[in-house]
């Protein structure tokens, strides 16, 4: 009993003798606990917020793109993938008024990766566009905006001036600062917009978006989602592994048919040119024969015949000039045909690329968000160790 009283007495004296240290430790523990709670709930809250947005926007799980687009055979194959919904679309990189700021124009999607409206409305007619929400301070609804395509490239758009109908957020581009690379302007993407699919002047789609049923209920930042998504990506890459060679055969066949028709046209033109040259040579021979007989004619007839010969020579000279121009044009067309044939012969296999949310063009924001959430979670896990180590000092 006496020992217990002595123990409590010593304990009380130790606290009363170092109140400052005791209060410091107590305050540190309280602040640390609050910080720990904040760290522990921040990462789940971030992920919950992002998952809610992905659900609302129906964000894709995987995307397929090809440098030659996706033809009917590709579309049919992708539509047959079990457990996945697929939607095809267009996109192209152009520049804004200053010719340097690159903007990516997407076709309006209906079921996957839909655009979330922030002001105004989505485009409903041709020559209408909804821009990225971070451009609200620079443009207004009802204003017109024009774009330029890369010089020397095949036009991707039917129109280049649009009326702004609203402002949107993308389901795929989460960052407003780091949007990745662009194929136009300065090479850095600065904005995006959405227009109707009918505004694209393209024969084939250039993106397929896929959404899988077994990924719908998973946390997009979880290990389970990443593993299943990776499995689907590998399966999809396997499905598309032979599409490049098959597509190349189709492209070469179509290209060769077109070149053969062009060659046939040039052959006919060359035959006509040779016939024209033959007639010209015959006409020149007749003129020379007539000219040699002028001296045999009486004076009056000789003057009249000489005038006729002079006029005939002029007409013949014009025909000769036309033939020379035709020969030059034919030679140029033959050279073009030979170059096209060489390009067709050297045509590489089309490349098919499968992207996930992080790796697809413009997906840097998703990657940054995922890394930030993981970093906060890691700090929350190690923070208690640091806190108690400091308290023990």
Model-derived segments and their meaning:
Residues 3-392:
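Membrane transport/envelope proteins' first extracytoplasmic loop
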